[in-house]
Amino acid sequence: KGAESVGAETEYFNLYDLVLKGCRSCLACKLKTKTKGRCYWRDDLTEVIDKILDADCLLIGSPIYFGQPTSEFRALVERLIFCVMSYDDGSSYFSGKVNVGIFYTMNAPLEFYEQSMKESLATTEYLFSFLNGEIVTYPVCDTIQVSDYSKFNMAGFSQELKEKQWILQFPDDLEKAFEIG
């Protein structure tokens, strides 16, 4: 919504709705032919990658499971970045510039993210540097996972505390996401 509010054209893709695979390390993107810098494999991710490489900005989000983004997110990063990464000198074959905003949602509190997750997620942020743009990361922490915790084996969480945190923090998270957009 933030990008649209300043006149940007936007397009939304839900990776869960696509039939896709991660990088197969076929190295066709490293051939000194027409496939250099482009992923050879064709699936639903092909159009997404092409549109990202033609865009000015990529806003991407993923929940964090077991300390990492989803497999679909990883598949996109593999296919998008590996094909533009030069094995000659470590530079980028990509001559354009795509600014990237990364949004992570997680059940963990912000303190845990800062102490235990931020550093491991920095690798993903580094990979986006091959798109030659600015990179902004925003963690949305201590999220509500379900509307009624009593229906689940989740006694380790207090629904009351989760809801209080959401009331305090979620409006700020929305505002920040809008600004980044």
Which sequence ranges carry the predicted segments?
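Short, glycine-/small-residue-rich phosphate/pyrophosphate-handling segment
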Residues: S71-E72, M85-Y138
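Short aromatic-enriched loop/helix-cap "lid" or pocket-rim segments at secondary-structure transitions
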Residues: C23-C26, E114-Q115, S147-F152
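Beta-strand-loop-alpha "switch" segments that mediate conformational coupling across diverse proteins
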Residues: V136-S147
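Membrane-targeting and insertion segments and their boundary/processing signals
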Residues: T46-D50, V98, S147-K151
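Short catalytic/ligand-binding loop motif for oxyanion handling, primarily in non-cytosolic enzymes
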Residues: G67-P69, L110-E111, V146-S147
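N-terminal beta1-alpha1-beta2 submodule of the flavodoxin-like/Rossmannoid cofactor-binding fold
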Residues: K1-D89, M154-G181
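Short, glycine/serine-rich, charged loops/turns that create anion-binding
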Residues: D17, N107-A108, D142
